[in-house]
């Protein structure tokens, strides 16, 4: 989770490194939500989050920043991020429903249904 270790951008900046950081933003603590949905379908608590403006964070560190909202945008955004001389954040916005690359909230609920 980027919000648990985003301060390492300052260390990278100080060390002269140029990291490319990919943030998958589904507006939730997805791993916790996945366990809640599997064990207690539709009874979730404390997993929806309001994220900060990651582009503003990128700018604050002098990094390149891009927000991607569709698959077709990713390749070009990633290429630009890799070309950045100062590091970059690429925020990939996904739906909360897409809880992981392999499943959805609906699928978890359906599998847990009696």
What is each of the regions a protein language model found here?
Residues 1-114:
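Thiamine diphosphate
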């Amino acid at each position: 989770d980027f919000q648990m270790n985003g301060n390492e951008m300052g260390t990278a900046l100080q060390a002269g490194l140029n990291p490319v950081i990919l943030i998958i933003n589904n507006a939730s603590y997805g791993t916790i939500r996945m366990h809640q949905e599997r064990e207690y379908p539709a009874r979730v608590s404390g997993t929806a989050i309001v994220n900060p403006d990651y582009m503003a964070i990128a700018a604050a560190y002098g990094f390149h920043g891009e927000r991607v909202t569709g698959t077709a945008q990713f390749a070009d955004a990633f290429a630009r991020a890799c070309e950045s001389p100062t590091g970059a954040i690429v925020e990939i916005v996904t739906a909360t429903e897409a809880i992981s690359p392999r499943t959805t909230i609906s699928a978890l609920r359906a599998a847990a249904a009696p």
